[in-house]
């Protein structure tokens, strides 16, 4: 049987619909004699075998998502290999559905076993999407934020659709303040601040002490090289440590929306206005791909393999 002629437009349409690779889309259309719906099913049926082949490939793109349900919030990160897939509606719907379940699941291991609308588990659904989309996909991480009373603010930076983007933040404010709307507005503002300023901890005590000592040592050696007397060096080091804290400790950072005030001062003012104590119980900040080693040659190697095969 001679090979059926498949138009470039049909391949392009299938790629846009599924996010699968160009060669995979062309093969699917050839195998199904150009039937578009059957081609989609063909890609889906390849699931398990394709997932195994792609599992070793680096997935550092994708999306983070934030979801709040009352006094519970969750942030997740689902990775793909390319930004193209992150802009694919099928992938976005997958991430959104997983985030909705994550609020209930509470842990990533439990989440992977939860059933989706298709009847498949989250883990099985991801495997099927690997086949359809044509890239390695991974549910990399999730974190939960729960408070007994107060408000949770969320913010997603570089949104591609609501609540999905490159950076996702949750901030939980523990308080019995009666004006929940104002408390939620403050939590939202602090979430935006956290996205932009990337604090490492809420207060001094939350900082990794090994990191503090390393900074202290660097400041000490630098001051010593400047030939300062020991008593001056000590004061200079303490001054630099205070500056370091003001850069990485949330409560000591200058507030994004009122730069003349620290976050701690803004909270103190809000306490006076709302007539109740307010405490930052926890914040979560996920930035897409942080900590993942990017494989620069991955795509080039894949292209070479296609052209040589």
Curated annotation (Swiss-Prot):
One of its GO terms (cellular component) is cytoplasm. Its main location: cytoplasm. CDD domains: UBA_EF-Ts. The keyword Cytoplasm applies. Pfam families: EF_TS. Keywords: Cytoplasm, Elongation factor, Protein biosynthesis. InterPro entries: EF-Ts_dimer_sf, Transl_elong_EFTs/EF1B, Transl_elong_EFTs/EF1B_dimer, Transl_elong_Ts_CS, UBA-like_sf. GO terms for molecular function: translation elongation factor activity. The keyword Protein biosynthesis applies. It is found in: Cytoplasm. Residues 82-85 are annotated as: Involved in Mg(2+) ion dislocation from EF-Tu. Associates with the EF-Tu.GDP complex and induces the exchange of GDP to GTP. It remains bound to the aminoacyl-tRNA.EF-Tu.GTP complex up to the GTP hydrolysis stage on the ribosome. Belongs to the EF-Ts family. This is Elongation factor Ts. It comes from Rickettsia massiliae (strain Mtu5).
